[in-house]
Amino acid sequence: FTSEPISDNILTKILHAAHHAPSVGFSQPWNFVLIKDNNTKKIIKESFQIEHKHASELIEDPKRSEYLSFKLEGIMESPVNICVTYDPTKFGPFVIGRTSIPEAGIYSVCCAIQNLWLAARTEGIGLGWVSILSNDVLKEQLKLPGHVVPVAYLCLGHVSNFETKPDLERVGWLPRLDLKDVVYYEKWEQKEDSGWKEIEQLIKTNLDTLK
């Protein structure tokens, strides 16, 4: 992140896009806690450092050393942090579409996060999702009610450039899976089906090469 601040106009446009995401039963179960206070950010950063160390203990060298070398947060450097939350009580206990699959509420919040991310990119704003954190620390520091769930902690700011590939793909931590390896037809792990021949062939050619 650079030191350039995000204008209020741009931040409002980004939040507007996030708030217009689709949601189960039109429940709009999200809230956006905006954070720029350095004292709060320092405490969140400390939580990251603790959880980061714990995570590193789950792997052995040389992977451990590689993991510890990655830049996985920009809490202090980014001018704006946003905690996106899920409130299951909005509009009462009955929400159309959530009775059979309660998790649809959190999935709706993820739609808002995706909208926020895309809108930020459109405005030339970089975004990092920090998930190496304690939700208990977030709830305490942000004074979230007991029933409200922190879903994402986002760092936003201007960046010097946008990479063409995700960082972890670029450094070889994990590969980008081919589309053909994640699409099944009609049944789990069924890789061929006569009813899907055309799309099957298109997918096998690799979408990145299609014009």
Residue ranges of each PLM-predicted region?
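Generic N-terminal amphipathic, Lys/Arg-enriched alpha-helix
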Residues: F1-E4
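Glycine-rich phosphate/pyrophosphate-binding beta-alpha loops
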Residues: H19-G25
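Glycine/small-residue-rich phosphate/adenosyl-binding loop
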Residues: Q28-V109
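Short secondary-structure boundary segments
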Residues: Y86, I132, H158
